């Protein structure tokens, strides 16, 4: 009886999440198509926009935010690229996991599968927070697949989290904890769109062990070593917000600037962790300027 109740709660909370996700996609300002591709870790949900014959840009979202978070950026970027907003498998989104991804090597293999399923030999990459860390990891493990990379507010990667990250993460058990977490990372300078906030709350309340990314020793979050960062050969644009809550952005900026060859790193004023949402106009143009410099 208890098991049946738990399964019912998981299904019910999952349906609420899917409904909230679809509602948040009403913010998507341009035509798109959604589909799944097969990987060794399960079916990965992707939202594609832009001309099919344009260069490819793969987008990786922040944890709990799903691909819906790209709504303020997608029109600008899809004017020059065929964009693929990928739901990171194992997080709260529409991807359907069938096997656990536990290591950084696993995550890189998953991304290779996504490339292969899309028929892409190479692509540009852009990601925020968790998605940004995935990109740094992929640059080390499959640099030949990446043209240029944009890393925004990466989750660790260059410097350890502030202890408050784990305090707020431990409280992510319901609506109140989710709202507290969102308020913490946005501060007083930005209000998340109610539809996106509702989706995040629904994700936190979704009782699904397969969609619950947990820290692991060989997974994420992770601070890359000096040797790893020095070995990056792909052109990288790295962006932080001046009001970053999760770590000391100036220290991360300085470490990246010293270690990563040729990196373009900057700290953007009047923004925090959710840089692409908080300052979309600036981020959109800066990313296009950087990426279009690498179109062959």
UniProtKB/Swiss-Prot annotation:
| Keywords (A to Z) from UniProt | Cytoplasm, Hydrolase
Q: What does this protein do?
A: Shows carboxylesterase activity in vitro.
In the UniProt record, which is one GO cellular component term? cytoplasm
EC assignment: the record states 3.1.1.1
- Report a single Gene Ontology molecular function: carboxylesterase activity
Q: What is its main location?
A: cytoplasm
**Which reaction is the catalytic activity of this chain?**
a carboxylic ester + H2O = an alcohol + a carboxylate + H(+)
In its UniProt entry, the species of origin is given as Bacillus subtilis (strain 168)
Which principal EC class is assigned to this enzyme?
hydrolase
Q: Highest taxon of the source?
A: Bacteria
Any idea where this protein resides? Answer: Cytoplasm
Q: What protein name is recorded for this chain?
A: Carboxylesterase YbfK
Q: Which family does it belong to?
A: Belongs to the AB hydrolase superfamily.
